[in-house]
Amino acid sequence: MAENTTTIAFTEEQEALVVKSWNAMKKDSAELSFKFFSKILEIAPPAKQLFSFLRDSEVPLDQNPKLKPHAMSVFLMTCESAAQLRKEGKVTVRESNLKKLGATHFKKGVIPEHFEVTKQALLDTIKEAVPELWSLELKDAWAIAHDQLASAIIAEMKPES
């Protein structure tokens, strides 16, 4: 059984920046999650092919019934994991969920480099959502948090056993 026992160096200041910005964004998380996902597709249009509910859809993104719930779950998981990183010292997504996420990403043909796109989309979304809080320090804190979650998923990207 794979365990994510790596303790993460995430400073108190980084945690405070992430928590403060996440608290400021939470109330708009439905709208922001859609923006986040739209940015992924803007940065990497071929990513649309990775999602069965988008692949052959002619429906505009904002009218796709499956996109918003998916975007919301990805955005919330990313942000909640980031906010818990220092307190827990590791990614707080349950191991069974990480295994499922890893297997699903593997099956869909996701490669580690794809997570750079999600990181850029996340940072762009946060920068637009809380411009008054945006700084190099905030960017770095969110980048570290994203990379920790991405690494945990990538570690589980293998065929289901």
Swiss-Prot record:
Residues that bind heme b: S52, K66, H70, K100, T104, H105
Keyword annotations from UniProtKB, A to Z: Heme, Iron, Metal-binding, Oxidoreductase, Oxygen transport, Transport
Catalytic function, reaction form: Fe(III)-heme b-[protein] + nitric oxide + H2O = Fe(II)-heme b-[protein] + nitrite + 2 H(+)
Chain's role: Phytoglobin that reduces nitrite to nitric oxide (NO) under anoxic conditions (e.g. during flooding or in waterlogged soil) and upon root nodulation. Required for general plant development and during nodulation, especially for the onset of symbiosis. Monitors nitric oxide (NO) levels during early phase of the nitrogen-fixing symbiosis and buffers oxygen in functioning nodules. Necessary for the production of pods. May not function as an oxygen storage or transport protein. Has an unusually high affinity for O(2) through a hexacoordinate heme iron because of a very low dissociation constant.
Disrupted gene: phenotype observed: Normal vegetative growth but slightly delayed flowering and reduced pods number.
Cofactor annotation: heme b
Domain Globin span(s) in chain numbering: 9-158
Organism annotation: Lotus japonicus
Enzyme class, first EC level, given as a word: oxidoreductase
Record-marked site positions (Homodimerization): K139
GO molecular function: heme binding; metal ion binding; oxidoreductase activity; oxygen binding; oxygen carrier activity
Signal peptide: none
Motif (Homodimerization): 42-46, 112-124
Cofactor details (free text): Binds 1 heme group per subunit.
UniProt name for this protein: Anaerobic nitrite reductase Glb1-2
Quaternary structure and partners: Homodimer.
